[in-house]
From Swiss-Prot:
Residues 404-503 form the ERCC4 domain. InterPro entries: EME1/EME2_C (IPR042530), ERCC4_domain (IPR006166), Mus81 (IPR033309), Restrct_endonuc-II-like (IPR011335), WH-like_DNA-bd_sf (IPR036388), WH_MUS81 (IPR047417), XPF_nuclease_Mus81 (IPR047416). Belongs to the XPF family. This is Crossover junction endonuclease MUS81. A motif (Helix-hairpin-helix motif 2) lies at residues 585-622.
Length: 659
């Protein structure tokens, strides 16, 4: 009989007896002991008796054959009544008991979805709401940007026909189950209502205190801030060309790695770009931690991308005063957004009161919005200052215009009734901005200035193109990426912004995407911004809208300064200009023909078009040298000062004039 079975390990006799005791308790119940349940107890009893090692914890028991979740839970009473101090320390949930004298409280990781949900629930319920619904909570948590990952399901995941796996349908909302199991959130009613428990409110407060966040208000405009009590904190902050918002205090990693681990020849690669050794070492540390690769020689390109992204995601430590009534100081965690652009600053006078200083340090969320130029040549930066819409003499922009964000109606989040449209509406209320949806001839979003009384609309010098990682990969492969960038550059905007959603490291074309972003920013003058998903992108639009308004807000029409200066085009003229750019011209056809010639690159084709915009004009030039074939073959090379190589010059001549 099983009752008389010998226990191999004497220390397990008590556990074996406890299994038999539980079996007897179930047998004495009115329903009795079912055949399956009896078999389960017998199997578990035999396994305990045959175990050669002592079973001291529930974790040890779970590894014994015959003890599933139900049996382990049933045996918990035995371990609770045993020698608690030694046994409980070995349980996974209680290993911290040696230091904390008890079970460690569950606290979500900083910038995780659980972290964002707890703080969002805490703020809303503190401000008078008793509970929040699921979709309301998802939209609010997505909008506040406290989570690095999207809270709701991302569009494009779990597409029909591609296998409905759990991984495809997983979203950040899944962590709500953990919060409920840990006793931090209570779910009730149908449809569900979510409320914080007393412990959940304590954990939310602890998260807020650890990260330096304010208790309630996320975003404040400059007009809503009272600089007087903050003057003691951080001087020399200028709100004229920036909007302000509460920001998390930067996390300082206590670990420090030796600078000598990076070879000097690798460090010297970053010197021409103006980066300090400390910046390079810190970037190497972050990149190597994320990739697992510790070899500096293979990481330097990724580090360069990381440093450039750090410049884009920067906060401005200080700005110059331009107006007496707007020179209030602000806290160090208030975000500043630079709209002038680092290239333009190099060529502008330091006495220009409207100039913003370059950003040197800041948080991972701050936006140095627009340093783009229409050409990669740095000398063009001097003309890269955004234009003003028409103003009467002495009239400020704030008195005459409102800034409105225009989204392309072909974007998914512009569809009525979609979840993303609810996020758009939430962004409107959260940032107190106006958003409209229209058909745009180029780009995914622009900003217009609408006259408060005349209702006339003028397009401001800012345009953004948005792509997720999958779209980026496909557009690179079919050359749409190159064509779209060219359309943006030809559209006449001063500030070009490219937003990439998602992590390229998870794509099979990761290196191609990183290289494309690198060249787009470094060589072509775009501002490349990275976001984690649609919610953060819309939030980024909100930041840019506020900062653009603050940049223009106090600009005044001064005849002495605005003589000969171009003004912003009207919305109708902008649409017409873009439509005209789409029309195929004779020069465009000629350029396509030239690109089919061997040895002719894009630069060579452009050089030919600069001198001879049509095939007829080039043929006419050849006709003047008809008697000298050698001179005809060398004509393009000589007249372009060797920009066009000899082989290309000869091949073009054969195309146009050859027999």
């Amino acid at each position: 009989m099983d009752d008389e079975r010998r226990v191999l390990c004497p220390e397990n006799r008590g556990l074996a007896a406890y299994v038999l005791q539980k079996k007897q308790e179930y047998a004495e119940k009115p329903k009795g002991l079912s055949e399956n349940l009896e078999r389960t107890f017998v199997k578990g009893y035999r396994s305990v008796c045959d175990a050669k090692d002592p079973i001291n914890t529930l974790k040890d028991l779970s590894q014994i054959k015959g003890f599933g979740k139900w049996m382990v839970k049933l045996m918990k009473g035995y371990f609770d009544t045993a020698v608690e101090s030694s046994e409980q320390e070995d349980l996974p949930d209680n290993r911290a008991g040696k230091k904390a004298n008890g079970k460690k409280r569950y606290i979500p990781q900083r910038n995780s979805v659980g972290y964002a949900l707890l703080i969002t629930l805490h703020r809303r319920t503190t401000n008078g709401k008793e509970f929040m619904r699921k979709q309301e909570l998802i939209d609010a948590a997505d909008a506040n940007g406290l989570s690095h990952a999207p809270v709701g399901p991302e569009k494009g995941k779990g597409k029909a026909g591609l296998g409905h796996s759990k991984r495809e349908w997983y979203s950040g909302w899944s962590c709500m189950t953990t919060l409920i199991q840990k006793g931090l959130v209570v779910k009730s009613s149908n449809p569900a209502k979510y409320m914080l428990t007393v412990e959940g409110r304590e954990v939310a407060n602890e998260c807020i205190l650890r990260s330096g966040l304010p208790d309630s208000v996320d975003i404040l405009s400059v007009d809503e801030m009272d600089p007087t009590p903050q003057a003691k904190k951080t001087p020399n902050q200028n709100p004229t060309c920036s909007f302000t918002m509460r920001e998390e205090l930067p996390y300082v990693d206590p670990r420090c790695r030796a600078q000598s681990a990076i070879p000097s020849d690798i460090l010297e690669k970053f010197t021409p770009f103006g980066y300090s050794k400390e910046q390079v070492v810190a970037a190497f540390r972050e990149v190597s931690d994320g990739s697992g690769d510790k070899d500096p020689s293979t990481l330097w390109l990724s580090v360069m991308c990381h440093l450039r992204q750090a410049e884009v995601y920067n906060s401005c430590p200080d700005s110059r005063n331009s107006k007496k009534d707007s020179s209030g100081p602000f806290k160090s965690q208030i975000r500043q957004v630079d709209l002038e652009g680092s290239r333009a600053k190099k060529f502008r006078s330091c006495n220009d009161g409207s100039t913003l200083n370059p950003c040197s340090s800041g948080s991972s969320h701050a936006v140095k919005a627009c340093s783009s130029s229409l050409a990669s040549d740095g000398t063009k930066g001097i003309t890269n200052i955004p234009r003003l819409p028409p103003l009467q003499f002495g009239e400020t922009f704030e008195e005459a215009y409102d800034v409105i964000l225009i989204l392309d109606d072909r974007e998914k989040f512009a569809t009525k009734g979609s979840r993303s449209r609810n996020i758009v509406e939430n962004i409107c209320s959260e940032f107190n901005i106006k958003i409209e949806v229209r058909r745009l001839p180029v780009g995914d979003c622009i900003w217009i200035a609408r006259h408060k009384y005349l209702e006339t609309e003028y397009v401001l010098d800012f345009i953004a193109e948005r792509k997720n990682v999958d779209d980026m990969r496909s557009s690179i492969r079919d050359n749409r990426y190159r064509d779209q960038k060219l359309r943006l550059q030809r559209s006449g905007f001063k500030k070009l912004i490219y937003i990439l959603e998602g992590d390229p490291n998870h794509s099979d074309a990761a290196e191609s995407i990183k290289t494309a972003c690198f060249t787009t920013e470094i060589l072509e003058g775009f501002d490349v911004l990275r976001t984690h998903g649609l919610g953060e992108t819309l939030r980024k639009y909100g930041y840019l809208t506020k900062s653009i308004y603050q940049y223009y807000k106090l600009r005044v029409n001064d005849n002495d300064q605005s003589k000969g200066a171009a003004s912003c085009p009207s919305f109708d003229s902008f649409v017409k200009r873009c439509q005209d750019l789409d029309k195929m011209t004779i020069s465009d056809v000629f350029a396509i023909q030239l690109m089919q010639v061997p040895q002719v690159t894009e630069e060579i084709a452009i050089a030919v078009l600069d001198m001879y915009p049509t095939l007829l004009s080039l043929a006419s030039a050849y006709s003047h040298l008809e008697a000298d074939v050698s001179a005809q073959e060398e004509m393009l090379r000589n007249r372009s000062n060797n920009v066009i190589c000899a082989s290309a010059s000869k091949n073009i001549f054969k195309l146009v004039w050859g027999e």
